[in-house]
């Protein structure tokens, strides 16, 4: 009985244990299934969110900016440029090449004793060439350099030139300057041409003719011009431009006491429409203290401070100058100019008048006064207008709408050009055959009619052809002004001639 009871008790206990274990196992499986279901729901939700993010990313614009600190290299219009991605630093390589060819159509040359045509005073070589100006070719400009930006607010420019007038030169600094551009009024320091006139405001690669009008070029050389030591201020807006520059010597000039000059210019666009505009302006070019030609010895009346006005007949294949005042011992020079220009669609015109007043030094003679003016116009047959540059207040060349490509029947832009200029460097000159009066200056009067065609194949290549009719009326001062073979006082030493020229230009 005892054994039976014990067995029964053991069986009941075993069944109870198995029942309890099964219940526990059933409870654990249910919890696991619930957790798995929850995880699957979370994965499904995450998958949906990822799909939405992919769709949104595909629809948004791509950020193509270079990584911070990266540099970019471009070749816009053939000009290699390296710049940082933020534009704070840049370097652009510049190149300018202008080759001129010319034919001078003159009366046949005779001996100096009977052929009185002359060039500059006291220059035997020019007086020989004035009777037979040299047909040929000349590299007018061959410049290479760099320009760019430093720390966002500084601009710089360095250009070296190997061209010349009549003959090529060994090389010289054309410009080397640094400019702070962080304020509306920009400050520039270095060696650069101050803006002297409307004619000077056009870039030398975009002017209507290959050389500036004679009077504008001469005024430019007083206190401006390439490679002149300068410090200047400029400011401009959509319709106005102001510039003021204090200048010194040019880099190729060696004197005792250097020249001190001032150049100021103001320009304004009073009227402007959709495809037309009017420009007015005024300029002043002053030599405050001319450069000294020797030691400043007080007992001898001080150093001679000469100024000289002369120019070529608006072309430089031959370097001879047909009008020339000679040296004038001066205390200073004041040249004042007025500007007027305008544009209607693809037709443009501009003109300037200049008055030049020279103040003699230590002299009772009258102060000489000279003047000159020009007017010129251009018409682009292919329809592109000249571009008015508000930063310089000047007109630059048209940009071809269809660059030259014969395969596509594209021929670039073609522009017709015309100009009349006159420049009078006479003071108390008197008439032919008359003796030279005290204080008189027989520098001559030059009148030039120019007609031309400019062909802009693209934004970097241009070919320009022109014809000039040159008339120079000039009387000999007598004495030894032209050397041993100086014609008698009052003899005509001017001349008439025709000049044909062709320029090829490449600029990047």
Predicted regions, residues:
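Acidic-residue sensor for enzyme active/binding pockets
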Residues: 40, 52, 147, 211, ...
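Outer-membrane beta-barrel pore domains
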Residues: 30, 72, 130-131, 284, ...
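Gram-negative bacterial Sec-dependent N-terminal signal peptides
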Residues: 1-25
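Short coil-to-helix leader/linker segments, especially the first N-terminal amphipathic alpha-helix
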Residues: 48-81, 393-396
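Outer membrane beta-barrel
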Residues: 77-290, 369-409, 413-431
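Alpha-helical, heptad-rich or low-complexity scaffold/stalk segments
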Residues: 26-61
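Short, solvent-exposed secondary-structure boundary motifs
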Residues: 63, 72, 135, 222-223, ...
């Amino acid at each position: 009985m005892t054994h039976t009871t014990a067995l029964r008790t053991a069986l009941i206990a075993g069944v109870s244990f198995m029942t309890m274990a099964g219940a526990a196992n059933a409870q654990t499986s249910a919890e696991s299934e619930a957790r798995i279901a929850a995880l699957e729901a979370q994965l499904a939700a995450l998958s949906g969110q990822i799909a939405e993010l992919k769709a949104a990313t595909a629809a948004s614009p791509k950020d193509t900016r270079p990584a911070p600190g990266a540099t970019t290299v471009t070749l816009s219009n053939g000009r290699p440029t390296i710049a940082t991605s933020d534009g704070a630093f840049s370097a652009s390589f510049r190149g300018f090449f202008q080759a001129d060819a010319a034919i001078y159509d003159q009366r046949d040359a005779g001996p100096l004793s009977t052929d009185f045509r002359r060039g500059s005073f006291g220059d035997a070589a020019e007086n020989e060439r004035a009777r037979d100006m040299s047909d040929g070719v000349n590299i007018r400009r061959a410049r290479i350099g760099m320009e760019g930006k430093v720390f966002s607010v500084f601009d710089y420019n360095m250009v070296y030139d190997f061209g010349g007038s009549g003959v090529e030169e060994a090389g010289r600094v054309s410009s080397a300057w640094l400019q702070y551009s962080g304020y509306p009024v920009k400050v520039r320091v270095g060696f650069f041409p101050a803006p002297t006139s409307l004619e000077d405001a056009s870039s030398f690669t975009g002017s209507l003719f290959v050389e500036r009008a004679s009077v504008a070029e001469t005024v430019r050389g007083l206190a401006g011009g390439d490679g002149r030591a300068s410090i200047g201020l400029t400011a401009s807006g959509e319709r106005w431009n102001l510039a003021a520059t204090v200048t010194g010597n040019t880099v190729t000039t060696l004197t005792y006491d250097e020249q001190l000059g001032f150049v100021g210019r103001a320009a304004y666009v009073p009227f402007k429409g959709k495809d037309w505009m009017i420009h007015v302006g005024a300029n002043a070019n002053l030599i405050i203290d001319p450069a000294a030609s020797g030691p400043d010895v007080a007992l001898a009346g001080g150093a001679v401070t000469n100024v000289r006005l002369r120019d070529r007949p608006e072309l430089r294949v031959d370097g001879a100058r047909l009008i020339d005042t000679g040296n004038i011992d001066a205390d200073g020079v004041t040249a004042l100019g007025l500007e007027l220009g305008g544009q209607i669609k693809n037709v443009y015109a501009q003109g300037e008048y200049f008055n030049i007043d020279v103040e003699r030094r230590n002299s009772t003679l009258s102060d000489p006064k000279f003047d000159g003016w020009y007017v010129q116009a251009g018409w682009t047959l292919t329809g592109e207008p000249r571009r008015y540059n508000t930063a310089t207040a000047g007109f630059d060349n048209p940009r071809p709408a269809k660059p030259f490509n014969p395969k596509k029947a594209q021929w670039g832009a073609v522009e017709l050009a015309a100009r009349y200029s006159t420049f009078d460097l006479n003071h108390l000159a008197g008439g032919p055959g008359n003796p030279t009066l005290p204080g008189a200056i027989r520098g001559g009067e030059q009148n030039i009619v120019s007609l031309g065609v400019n062909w802009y194949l693209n934004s970097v290549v241009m070919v320009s052809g022109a014809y000039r009719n040159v008339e120079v009326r000039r009387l000999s001062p007598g004495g030894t002004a032209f050397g041993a073979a100086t014609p008698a006082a009052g003899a005509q030493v001017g001349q008439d001639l025709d000049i044909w020229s062709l320029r090829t230009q490449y600029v990047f």
